[in-house]
Amino acid sequence: MEKVKLGIVGGSGIYEIDGVQDGNWISVDTPFGAPSDEIFTGSLNGIDVAFLPRHGRGHVHTPSNVPYRANICALKSIGVTEIVALSACGSLREDMKPGEFVIVDQFVDRTFQRSKTFFDQGCVAHVSVADPVCHRLGDMCRQVMDDLGLTYHHKGTYVTMEGPQFSTRAESILYKDVWNCDVIGMTNMPEAKLAREAEICYASIAMVTDFDCWHEDHDS
C-alpha cells in the first residue's frame, strides 16, 4: 500500500481538499473497525498526504460516534507520521472572533461516551499528554498562516464537550471565566490523546465560527 506522511483530518464542512495530484480514495481496515470514511491519498505541493473527513462525507457521524480509534489507527497504518486536524469551534473570548483561527496548544476533555485509549483489554500503558500537541508542527502551521495573511491566534485552550447539544449558558461561563478556556468544540478529544499514544505528531487548527452562548451575539 502507498505510504504517506501528512494526515489531514477535516472537520465540519470539510469533506475534500483541492490541489491534490494523483488522488484516490482507499479503504482501510483496522482492529477497531472502519474509520469515518475512505482515506483520500495523493500528493499536495510535493508532499504525500492522506485526507480523512472526521464526520464522513455527508456528515454521517455525530461527535460522539466518530470512530476516533479507527481513524488514528488507519492513518498510522498507511504511514502517517504527522496530523493537522481542522475543526469548527465556538469562541470563549471577545478577541477570538468569528472567521479567525486558533492554533490550539492545550485541551480540557469533557467527553464521557468515547473510547479514549488503545491500551485496554490486557494491554496497559500510561502515556503523558501534558503537552498534547506537536509544537514543531504547530510552528509550521503558524508560518503557513503568516504566508497566507490569515488572522490567527498563536495558542489557545480548547475545551471538548460531548455534544451533540451545545453548552448551557452556565457551562459556557464556567469554561470561560473559571477554567480560562479559549474555544469550545466537540471533536479534538480523544483524537489528540490517541495520536499521542500512536506516536503521531498532532496539531490542531480551530476555526472560530461563532461566539459561544456566554456572548450576547452568539446567535448572530
Per-region residue spans from a language model:
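Active-site glycine- and acidic-residue-rich loops that bind
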Residues: 130-135, 165-166, 177-187
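Short acidic/polar active-site loop segments enriched in Thr and Asp
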Residues: 81-82, 182, 201
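Generic non-transmembrane alpha-helical segments
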Residues: 136, 140-151
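Generic hydrophobic/aromatic pocket-lining and core-packing "Φ" positions
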Residues: 72, 172, 189-192
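Metabolite-binding pocket within alpha/beta catalytic cores that recognizes anionic/polar moieties
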Residues: 1-130
